[in-house]
């Protein structure tokens, strides 16, 4: 730090909390702020980006369903959010598969969550496995430098199983009002 601030939290921070009200009850959230961008990561749902704010202004679409911790049909729980990761068995509405897959509903195991003078850094793993079947580990790293306009998301998929596995992956980005409004270009 350069002497003008006594605590890094004056310019950047990471806070963890659990939602306690209504259908959001039980959602675990990482509330990250780099001084210019604020982003809420949903630890309960694949470390997806629930909401993104730029200089205090929301840029994410949130559906009328809002956020939910409950396991209910897709049409009743699709929340939108800035980033909704679809997969790994399916991304569409194929017969026998859930719309957009099940990955988004898998909880993340946070391996690291820290804020340093370089920036906000979160690392997590999401396991997708079954007895006598697939054993995939989805690793996500989220980084944003202090004072930056950018959010970097790096994903790696590791197959820890004995056989090759097919997978599909779709990044569903949901931009909303006020960024997406009449006259937007």
Where do the model's predicted regions map?
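Surface-exposed acidic/polar loop and edge beta-strand patches at domain peripheries
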Residues: 1-152, 163-166, 175-185
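Aromatic- and glycine-enriched beta-alpha-beta binding-site module
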Residues: 169
């Amino acid at each position: 730090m350069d002497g003008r601030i006594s605590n890094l939290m004056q310019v950047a921070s990471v806070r963890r909390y659990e939602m306690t009200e209504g259908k959001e009850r039980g959602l675990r959230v990482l509330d990250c702020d780099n001084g210019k961008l604020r982003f809420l990561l949903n630890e309960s749902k694949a470390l997806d980006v629930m909401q993104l704010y730029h200089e205090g202004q929301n840029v994410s679409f949130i559906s009328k369903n809002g956020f939910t911790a409950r396991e209910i049909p897709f049409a009743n729980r699709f929340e939108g959010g800035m980033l909704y990761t679809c997969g790994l068995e399916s991304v569409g509405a194929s017969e026998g598969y859930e719309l957009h897959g099940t990955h988004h509903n898998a909880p993340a195991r946070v391996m690291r969550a820290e804020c340093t003078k370089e920036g906000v850094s979160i690392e997590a793993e999401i396991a997708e496995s079954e007895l006598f079947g697939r054993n995939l580990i989805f690793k996500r790293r989220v980084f944003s430098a202090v004072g930056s306009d950018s959010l970097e998301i790096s994903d790696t998929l590791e197959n820890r199983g004995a056989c090759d596995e097919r997978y599909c992956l779709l990044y569903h980005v949901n931009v909303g009002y006020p960024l997406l409004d009449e006259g937007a270009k």
